[in-house]
A protein has these predicted regions:
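Beta1/beta-strand and adjacent pyrophosphate-binding region of the FAD-binding site
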Residues: 4-18
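Glycine-rich active-site loop/strand segments that organize a redox cofactor
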Residues: 53-101
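A glycine-rich dinucleotide-binding beta-alpha-beta segment and adjacent secondary-structure elements
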Residues: 131, 331-405
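A conserved short coil-to-beta-strand element within the FAD-binding core of flavoproteins
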Residues: 131-144
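Glycine-rich FAD pyrophosphate-binding loop
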Residues: 11, 27-51
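Core beta-strand elements of the Rossmann-like FAD/NAD(P) dinucleotide-binding domain
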Residues: 6-8, 149-158, 257-259
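An anion/pyrophosphate-binding glycine-rich loop and adjacent beta-alpha core
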Residues: 40-42, 47-48, 57-63, 96, ...
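Short hydrophobic core segments
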Residues: 11-13, 36, 135, 154-170, ...
Length: 427
């Protein structure tokens, strides 16, 4: 072996949440670890998450909170490293935290405390952190991996790819992980923006006049199929790059419903409910909203209008809607979704539509506004307990680079911690 190579047991590419956790676990096992990060500082997504307070996990985390071409893949890693395990580490450092809602755990103070904790744990494990390591190139041999970078050349028996996805490119997101997967012949599920605002156009563009209006709703995407033309390469949403992607078979998606807030924006729809549903939405499919989540299914919103002698007109309709919806939203829905006529049957049809209002988004706001990237390295290429590539011993993929995407609320961080621990114990 050439003597000019810096030799380690493990090289981790990417000092985000997953890469840091993997380096911590491997280093504290006594492995010599080099952690290479192309940015000038580690953990940039950690620092901005949760409005700067880091929604670092969710108490109610389970496999059902994730989606993937293989919904069973995440089970092993999530079982091995649970939210309580990360919380034990947080409490050991005396970091104050609180549960905000729906099991979401946040720091009382700055997200910086989580990053500092992980960096201190890296130091305890003797991890060498190399920042501004750019121009990465990887060569494999029978004994390990040679990584060339702007900071020189490194060699290790094991290589862990924790380079994340394409979301929030201003933080330095790249497609390196997908390129490395393609280099080693691994399939990649086409990356797409997830937890992302949706854009309205055409006949629905008028909704943007309500920008700033929020309401409690139930949101869901209709079940559909992820379509990739037979024999064609799936396209990534980044400058037309394919990253060597292969066709993905048709796969039916289940409908998952989310009851949270929606927000009308200057371009379309956002808010937690819509962000959640966006991960399950595909172009050409409908997004459905129930504007009456507080009203029992058997309740009659327009009972008052149906009484003998009751006023039945647009004014009365607006008044009824304002009892359950914000005024601007109630007025708009009355204008565009009011009954065709004022018979009881027409009022009942109007209520049914309010419980299942169909939008047809023209797209998303893209990776620039997406909180995470869905898709990634096909889990069929990886060993579920270790994250090791089945066809390339010593090569591991973890975190957002893998086709496992969590729902909003700390689940993606828990996947980062869990997949990082799984690989860190195996390298």
């Amino acid at each position: 072996m050439p003597t000019d190579l810096r030799q380690f047991d493990v090289i981790v590419l990417g000092a985000g949440a997953a890469g840091l956790m993997c380096a911590v676990v491997a280093g504290q096992r006594g492995r010599r670890v080099a952690l290479l990060e192309h940015n000038g500082q580690p953990g940039r997504k950690i620092l901005i998450s949760g409005g700067g307070r880091c929604n670092f996990t969710n108490l109610h985390c389970g496999p059902e909170n994730f989606h993937s071409e293989n919904p069973h893949f995440a089970k092993s890693a999530l079982a091995l490293f649970q939210p309580r395990h990360f919380l034990e580490l947080v409490e050991r450092y005396g970091i104050a935290w609180h549960e905000k809602t729906l099991g979401q755990l946040f720091c009382d103070g700055s997200a910086r405390t989580i990053l500092d904790m992980l960096l201190e744990e890296c130091e305890r494990g003797g991890v060498e952190v190399v920042l501004n390591a750019r121009e990465i190139a990887v060569e494999a041999s029978s004994s390990g991996f040679r990584v060339s970078s702007s900071h020189g050349e490194f060699w290790a028996e094991s290589l862990v790819v924790a380079t994340g996805g394409l979301s929030i490119p201003k933080l330095g997101a790249t497609g390196l992980g997908y390129e490395l997967a393609a280099q080693f012949g691994l399939n990649v599920i086409a990356p797409r923006p997830a937890l992302v605002p949706l854009v309205l156009g055409g006949d629905e563009a008028g909704w943007t006049e309500l920008a700033g209006v929020a309401a409690d709703v139930v949101a869901w995407a209709e079940p559909g199929f992820e379509k990739h033309p037979s024999g064609a390469k799936a396209q990534a949403h980044s400058a037309g790059s394919t990253y060597g992607l292969k066709p993905v078979p048709f796969k039916e998606l289940k409908s998952v419903r989310f009851r949270e807030k929606m927000l009308v924006t200057h371009r379309g729809l956002s808010g937690p409910a819509v962000l959640q549903a966006s991960s399950y939405w595909r172009p050409g499919e409908a997004l459905l909203l129930n504007f009456l989540p507080e009203l029992a299914a058997q309740a009659d919103l327009f009972d008052g209008l149906k009484q003998p002698g009751a006023r039945r007109d647009l004014v009365a309709l607006r008044r009824a809607l304002r009892e359950v919806l914000p005024q601007r939203l109630a007025n708009y829905l009355a204008e565009i979704g009011g009954p065709k006529g004022w018979s009881n049957a027409a009022l009942e049809e109007c209520e049914r539509r309010l419980r299942r209002w169909e939008f047809n988004p023209v797209g998303t706001e893209g990776f620039e506004k997406a909180e995470v990237t869905a898709g990634g390295v096909d889990t069929r290429e990886l060993q579920a307990r270790t994250m090791e590539a089945l066809s390339a011993p010593g090569l591991f993929f973890i975190g957002e680079a893998v086709d496992v995407t969590g729902q909003l609320g700390g689940f993606n961080f828990q996947w980062a911690w869990a997949s990082g621990v799984a690989a860190g114990r195996a390298v």
